[in-house]
Amino acid sequence: MTTCAHIRLAASPTTWGVDFADNPHNPAWNRVLDEIEASGVDTLELGPVGYLPEDPQILGPELESRGLSTAGTFMFQPIFDDAREDEVLDVARRTSGLVRELNGDFLILVDQPTDTRVATAGRSATATRMDDAHRRRYLERVRKIGTIAGENGLRA
């Protein structure tokens, strides 16, 4: 990572406007890696799951050829949604495994909000609340993701 005093800097595809992996207007991933290399930053946060190749045999050499290392990545997934738990845990497994293979060391969890939650964001009085049972299931799902990350040598 580029170091400045006690600050370590890394770049991410999100810096290039890649907020969602499936956006048809995203720039080509190899172009983004070329531009990150040209910026002088030598460490990468992998950005939205699915934007960069998920095969470490493809992505690893692409990063290495540009002198880029991996810090980790984030999971922007519907952790809140009980019905999508299997999908979320699958993404956690795939993503943690990829980060491990690329010698990264962290996984950041970002809960993808529902339309209802977005509509009331910043308005505490009208925001939807989880009941106790949902809160317990949510926290258990977060713990499961943390366990998956830990089994891959990552901090979550």
Feature locations, PLM:
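Short glycine-enriched loops at secondary-structure junctions
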Residues: L63, V110-D115
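Active-site gating loops and adjacent loop-to-helix segments of metal-dependent hydrolytic enzymes
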Residues: R117-A133
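N-terminal pre-domain/capping segments
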Residues: M1-F106, T128-L154
